[in-house]
From Swiss-Prot:
Organism: Bombyx mori
Lineage: Eukaryota, Metazoa, Ecdysozoa, Arthropoda, Hexapoda
Principal subcellular localisation of the protein: secreted
Subcellular localization: Secreted
Residue stretch(es) of the prosequence: 46-64
SUPFAM superfamilies to which the protein is assigned, alphabetical: Insulin-like (SSF56994)
Protein name: Bombyxin B-10
Disulfide bonds: 27-73, 39-86, 72-77
Keyword match Coiled coil: no
GO molecular function, one term: hormone activity
């Protein structure tokens, strides 16, 4: 009986961890509202912290060329991806 209880606890913990990483598609107003809710209170970087345009384009890689719509509307994304657009 004790092993069954431990097994059920382990399974429930594994399931709850996976549930947090479920990807959804966010488009249009739903995308804007979700970003607003997630980013509310997140401190934005000042302009002085940004690199010059020529340096930024050179070192950004593929992530810098994608938009939030590319990543979360055209295909599913997690809340962690959306949070990366808050700063």
């Amino acid at each position: 009986m004790k092993t069954i209880l431990i097994f059920l606890v382990v399974i429930s913990l594994m399931y709850s961890g996976e549930a947090q990483e479920v990807a959804h598609t966010y488009c249009g107003r739903h995308l804007a509202d979700t970003l607003a809710d997630l980013c509310f209170g997140v401190e934005k970087r000042s302009g002085a912290q940004y690199a010059p345009y020529f340096w930024t384009r050179q070192y950004l890689g593929s992530r810098g060329k994608r938009s939030v719509v590319d990543e979360c509307c055209f295909r599913p994304c997690t809340l962690d991806v959306l949070l990366s657009y808050c700063d």
